């Protein structure tokens, strides 16, 4: 959990983790999808709706390709998208 004043540093760390995972592990690795979801949660916590939605949608797209739209992670990501959109 991050205090709002620490958000820029946390955002950079989460973003770097995601970029490294994408580069070295690819989207086939579950932890890459989770890292994208976590960055989306951080954006959402700080009321950055568009950034959060972008992360959740990207993670959802890769999760559906990997495990199908009925997977637990895909359903969780859809819930996040729904909450942020409302």
Model-derived segments and spans:
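Intrinsic-disorder-linked linear interaction elements in eukaryotic regulatory proteins
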Residues: 1-86
